[in-house]
């Protein structure tokens, strides 16, 4: 009986140790930051030396979370369903320690023109990393994209097959991101970086946009984070930073419809917390702190007097964003919180409002995510 108990204990120990070891190994492997993967179609003004027909090749950029071992080489493979492998190319790679990341981009003109295709439809791809020193070849990310085409703005008989190709990114529109940003004048390991962080969020639009967005923050049904000087608002949120933009490489007819942009907005008068000796009072009023006002919040985004977006979130008593678990469950690969975005009005033109269900993150839809 005692021997049986010892054997059972040993088996349980080995099982638990195995789980911990596997988890530790997984943590020491490179991963892809999913929201950094951006794939576009690069249009060539030629197809198999025929300038009356245009073709395309892929361009991709992404960020890899370390460690990336010495001797590693990132590469990407694209496959057309029913036709097998299409193009494979290397991406610039550098050895990177754990806790740091490496951003790279590749494809486009690095691919020979004779590899261009006129195919439009679903395309599969895989981001891989080989290391001949270690004898390994691992898949880091697999995805699929929808490629479509639209006629260029050129006219005449020779322009009949001048099509411009693009990747459909409608799935992005209902997906938003909340995040805090450190004060970057301090070293990476200096705790002062996070003593007074900035509050930002990001969201997507489709189409050409000018004179862009105004962000408004609400808590308990009232707008907060406003400061004024002599009757004029000071320190209004800035939404002019473009994080990502997908645009066609040639002009199209119709124009301006095939542009997807991820904008970053930063609230300069709203802070998650303030652990510095700096005073909360400014010449224009008191800074608004999440740590003093926990609870539910809503961001409303206006454009030219019209409401175009709404997203909701919560903060705790320390001023931290309440994690809804979506980014963690889907292994986003960074510290951003994913939130659903309500798309309001016709600012973005016609778009596929259900694409997020199947196409999000290139065929890797979010678990636990729903759109209001």
Question: Which sequence ranges carry the predicted segments?
Answer:
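Bacterial N-terminal signal peptides that target proteins for export
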Residues: 1-10
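Bacterial N-terminal signal peptides
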Residues: 9-18
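Sec/Tat signal peptide C-region and signal peptidase I cleavage site
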Residues: 19-24
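Contiguous segments within soluble domain cores/interaction surfaces
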Residues: 25-139, 169-301, 309-311, 317, ...
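Short, structured interface segments
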Residues: 138-147
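Extracellular interdomain linker/stem segments of modular secreted and single-pass surface proteins
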Residues: 146-154, 316-322
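Acidic, serine/threonine- and glycine-rich low-complexity intrinsically disordered segments
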Residues: 148-164, 171, 179
């Amino acid at each position: 009986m005692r021997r049986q108990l010892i054997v059972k204990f040993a088996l349980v120990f080995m099982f638990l140790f195995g789980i911990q070891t596997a988890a530790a190994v997984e943590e020491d492997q490179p991963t892809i930051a999913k929201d950094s993967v951006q794939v576009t179609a690069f249009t060539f003004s030629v197809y198999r030396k025929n300038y009356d027909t245009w073709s395309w090749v892929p361009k991709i950029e992404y960020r890899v979370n370390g460690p990336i071992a010495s001797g590693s080489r990132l590469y990407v493979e694209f496959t057309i369903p029913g036709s097998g492998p299409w193009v494979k190319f290397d991406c610039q790679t550098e050895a990177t320690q754990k806790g740091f990341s490496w951003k790279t981009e590749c494809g486009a003109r690095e691919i020979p023109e004779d590899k261009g295709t006129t195919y439009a439809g679903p395309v599969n791809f895989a981001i891989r990393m080989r290391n001949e020193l270690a004898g390994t070849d691992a898949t880091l990310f697999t995805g699929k994209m929808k490629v479509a085409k639209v006629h260029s703005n050129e006219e005449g008989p020779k322009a009949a097959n001048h099509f411009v190709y693009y990747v459909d990114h409608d799935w992005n529109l209902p997906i938003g991101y909340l995040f805090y940003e450190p004060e970057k004048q301090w070293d990476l390991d200096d705790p002062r970086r996070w003593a007074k962080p900035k509050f930002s969020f990001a969201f997507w639009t489709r189409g050409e946009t000018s004179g862009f967005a105004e962000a408004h923050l609400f808590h308990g049904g009232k707008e907060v984070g406003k400061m004024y000087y002599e009757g004029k608002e000071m320190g209004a949120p800035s939404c002019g930073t473009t994080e990502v933009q997908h645009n066609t490489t040639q002009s199209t007819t119709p124009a301006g419809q095939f542009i997807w942009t991820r904008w970053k907005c930063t609230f300069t008068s709203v802070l998650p917390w303030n652990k510095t000796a700096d005073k909360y009072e400014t010449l224009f009023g008191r800074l608004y702190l999440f740590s003093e006002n926990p609870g539910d919040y809503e961001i409303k985004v206006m454009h030219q007097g019209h409401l175009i977006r709404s997203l909701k979130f919560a903060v705790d008593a320390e001023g931290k964003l309440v994690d809804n678990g979506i980014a963690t469950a889907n292994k986003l690969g960074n510290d951003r919180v994913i939130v659903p975005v309500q798309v309001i009005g016709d600012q973005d033109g016609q778009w596929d409002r259900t694409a997020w269900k199947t196409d999000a993150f290139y065929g890797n839809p979010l678990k636990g995510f729903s759109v209001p």
